Amino acid sequence: MTEDCLNGRRTAFDDPYKPGRNALSGIQQVIEAQSPPDLVILLLGTNDFQSVHQHKPWHSTMGISALVHAIRTAPIEPGMPTPPILVIAPPQLDNPRGPIGPKFAGGDTAARGLARAIRQISEDAGCLFFDSNTIITSSKHDGVHLDADQHHALGVALAPVVADLMADRDGG
């Protein structure tokens, strides 16, 4: 398992203040470096709704669609399998507040319908989908991030999903 989180990462958009936050710009190299991955899990979209962007769910899902395409067309060695992709809708922003509040001002309104839009783009692209909103909420402290208990609950919920995917992939 390889984890590749980066604070502030967007699906396919640049951060005007912090370079290197565009997931699309490096995803193919990550796939190639980790080839062949058994599964790719994408949990992105929250940062697409920072106040520097005027995005709606459609924009974020176009970023996810571009990531899926990039993963499937990564320059891996001939004969290596293309991994299945599990797309996870992030929890809905909930009244961003505290020091991070201005950074996400209006994001909770702009992101309404994101999970539904991600579900649709995932189905259209033949990706697996999981809605984290069925298990967790955004942080009680800032309305944006996940608190430790949400991380744990999401991990517990995803463990059997991933185990089943790996068993199916391995023919078991």
How would you describe each model-predicted region?
Residues 20-172:
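Alpha-helical cap/lid subdomain in secreted, periplasmic
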Residues 1-13:
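A short beta-strand-loop structural module common to alpha/beta enzyme folds
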Residues 11-22:
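Structural motif
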